[in-house]
Amino acid sequence: MSENRIRIATRKSPLAMWQAEFVKAELERIHPGIVVELLPMSTKGDVILDTPLAKVGGKGLFVKELEVAILEDQADIAVHSMKDVPVDFPEGLGLEVICEREDPRDAFVSNIYKTISELPLGATVGTSSLRRQCQLRASRPDLIIKDLRGNVGTRLAKLDNGEYDAIILAAAGLIRLKLSGRIASFISAEQSLPANGQGAVGIECRTNDERVKALLAPLEHLETRYRVIAERAMNTRLEGGCQVPIGAFAEINGDEMTLRGLVGNPDGSEIIEGIITGPKTEATQLGVALAEELLSKGAKSILDAVYAKA
């Protein structure tokens, strides 16, 4: 492999391509003369579009094929949305870089209504996320929530075609695709706790590839890493996959981190919440401690029931 070349495995969706192009541009800016190639490919999560994600099952629906490409030396790195990245990595691969986070909030998108509270009784809302569903149903049990799959453009088209009164999407994806004008309102973390890692981009590579690791190092954003590590540690202790009714959101003020977490029944009948504060350098311990608190309040029975239905 040329010392001045790097190959990026990426999903083919517009948002995934944006993330890969972002990393490509950053590498070219930091390392003038470097040759960066994009290798777009489809993953299981991209191909199975007629089934709710929670029923597709398994972890790593959007990353496995990319990891195989790195392990087989067809690619040097893979660029991921952190909320899609499983907790465990194949032997020989690791999460080398977490880039600076975009807005982690959920976005309320509607052509008619400005906020969730404006939705009329019995309105139809589209989201495939069990996390969003449980929080939405808890606050508005009258709403009809329907599954929503596909890339951002497909989801917006379904809204525009009148299939839904509103849809909920990650704000970061809309902002990155220059579609922030479609956002009717941002949903506060207090109203809809984000998914762990939401809004952050991670870069995976071979753990023994010192050449690539050195090229990637300047893209690391330490504060984002602390936040995402805490959120993922909580999810790991709860044994959560990609599609679970779990929310986690860390914020940093100086050297202190505050981590909020929740586990909810997808029907909105029960939501277990917790909050913890401590040194940001103890991100993993904070995440595990908060998970233990949620488990002590009964989170395991909710998650067991969700997995039994999947």
Curated annotation (Swiss-Prot):
It catalyses: 4 porphobilinogen + H2O = hydroxymethylbilane + 4 NH4(+). Pathway: Porphyrin-containing compound metabolism; protoporphyrin-IX biosynthesis; coproporphyrinogen-III from 5-aminolevulinate: step 2/4. GO terms for biological process: protoporphyrinogen IX biosynthetic process. Its cofactor is dipyrromethane. Its EC number is 2.5.1.61. It is an enzyme of class 2 (transferase). The porphobilinogen subunits are added to the dipyrromethane group. This is Porphobilinogen deaminase.
